[in-house]
Amino acid sequence: MNTKMNERWRTPMKLKYLSCTILAPLAIGVFSATAADNNSAIYFNTSQPINDLQGSLAAEVKFAQSQILPAHPKEGDSQPHLTSLRKSLLLVRPVKADDKTPVQVEARDDNNKILGTLTLYPPSSLPDTIYHLDGVPEGGIDFTPHNGTKKIINTVAEVNKLSDASGSSIHSHLTNNALVEIHTANGRWVRDIYLPQGPDLEGKMVRFVSSAGYSSTVFYGDRKVTLSVGNTLLFKYVNGQWFRSGELENNRITYAQHIWSAELPAHWIVPGLNLVIKQGNLSGRLNDIKIGAPGELLLHTIDIGMLTTPRDRFDFAKDKEAHREYFQTIPVSRMIVNNYAPLHLKEVMLPTGELLTDMDPGNGGWHSGTMRQRIGKELVSHGIDNANYGLNSTAGLGENSHPYVVAQLAAHNSRGNYANGIQVHGGSGGGGIVTLDSTLGNEFSHEVGHNYGLGHYVDGFKGSVHRSAENNNSTWGWDGDKKRFIPNFYPSQTNEKSCLNNQCQEPFDGHKFGFDAMAGGSPFSAANRFTMYTPNSSAIIQRFFENKAVFDSRSSTGFSKWNADTQEMEPYEHTIDRAEQITASVNELSESKMAELMAEYAVVKVHMWNGNWTRNIYIPTASADNRGSILTINHEAGYNSYLFINGDEKVVSQGYKKSFVSDGQFWKERDVVDTREARKPEQFGVPVTTLVGYYDPEGTLSSYIYPAMYGAYGFTYSDDSQNLSDNDCQLQVDTKEGQLRFRLANHRANNTVMNKFHINVPTESQPTQATLVCNNKILDTKSL
């Protein structure tokens, strides 16, 4: 399927305990009543507003997309700007507070044409945070049981039942008890505990007391909380949901006071937008709104099992809500998630020609393993990416043969069978590849972040720690679908500082501030299961997207790219170099050797530099045999060389860079010939069958076609039937509409290993068989 949105461990001691039911009055003093006796708001941003407008109305203006953005960032504060074609929350805070007089905004385009007028919501209607709990009784919640019975759970057997996701064990005990009290300890512990749901639970309570060295996670409704050693947690079921004692305090948290707000539609958010804001007789204009590219993220997912079955733990791929949540953390206008069917490889061919059928003889690990690198990363992930670029074949080893012109990532779960057993791989990202173990949480945000060009601990404390409102690198997130702010601190009051490199950020009202995804951060709550990037990182991410092209069926070239000067998306020509070429050794520049190379390669290059130089370069006479051949000289050595060509001798000095093309009679000198060719998809965003594998142009290593991979969304290119000779290396694919022939490189890109191939064909064409051919010889055939 594809989803689019426009938007350390030790063995615990085993202990036995008795459980009993106490039919005696409960001491009221054990429980605390949390009432709504303090309704005063807690404001995050209490700084004095700074005027952003021109005119009689003075007001500070901010916008919120994936996070709150200042109209005019403070000096030295690296913040992202608005993303085109993404809806935005407009936040207006008058310098002179007035919460009563209505505020309107009039939007105009770069031609001063009115786009529309909106009346802003008053400060009393400012959206809540994701920590705000709905359904709380006006009088608050009294955490006192309705009657005097309780059940104590303190045996290993009973505690083990608590990991049931339905919460059935706790539910059964609550039927005849007002309170269930659960004691965890070393040897009597589970990682996850679930509270039950049901109308018969009204007024019931659950209390957790932990003396376990390991933390547990308590799940209640759509929320969760960590239970740590020494902690006590108290819950009560009210109005159809569980509430935890102490969490209602978060209902008081709000971004700032005196803020008027309205949602601006996505089609208004384009360069040239200006706003006229009116309050009573006052009016102010915001002209210089910086709006950047409508960036797009294309994310492929695939679950791979190498000599073992796939793990079936790619949670992100299965969860559309996870797609939506991650989209809310990045500055793009569109994100497409393309899920591939799981891939079970019962045998694995390596580029060396070694076929693995049982296990990889080497060891593997989270960050290691031959199959992890060669198959999961290079062949499958880059294979998916490169097939969408129309790049049919590349070097068999390494990650360098990847153009990365589009923000296109292939994320994979993979595990393999090695000499040290079945090993799960994860924890790496970059260059269009994401290798993941856990796909919900910071590992995902972190490894995808590497693909955006983010390193670890970007800019140290000043760039990697979320800050309070008066500091640089401060913001809140925004969920534009749920209409909720996401504070940059955790919901629990722990009074912890956030420190990095001997610098610390004090907590906000006891709440610890977060860290960036690239600096050991974590999601703030279950409301969004991904880590909020700091403004500093978000600005870098935005620059990444603004420097990438997008697939675009409406473009004459099949791609579009943001032009920062014109502030428009313009046609972008994606080119690849498929010319057969070689760089001649400086020790083999005789006429006969050069003639031999020219007979085999369309382009022969001579590149010299200090330490890699020879005096004479001999070129064969132009003839019908070498008509169309290209010779390119790049001379960077300090010593001169002599080029013998066209019956003449030519001095070649440092800095000389030219090409010669044979017309059959003469070598004609010209500027360096660009042999790259433009690639434009033939079909856009269609279900694809992706074919990958290895082939050896020399025919000495065993070529191999892997099982087909099936994706829901990809790009296909016309085949090369019109430009192929029978001797050319090619992949032939039989379909219901006939045979397709795709050109592959005729020479090894790496001297000692095979080349990779990676090609998309439309699934609709019903491909049935693939055949690898070189020099008119069949290398391998695969039924699809």
List where the protein language model places each region:
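Propeptide-to-catalytic entry region of secreted or membrane-anchored zinc metalloproteases
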Residues: N45-K151, Q241, E247-L440, Y452, ...
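Tight coil/turn sites that cap or link beta-strands
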Residues: S228-T232, S653-K657
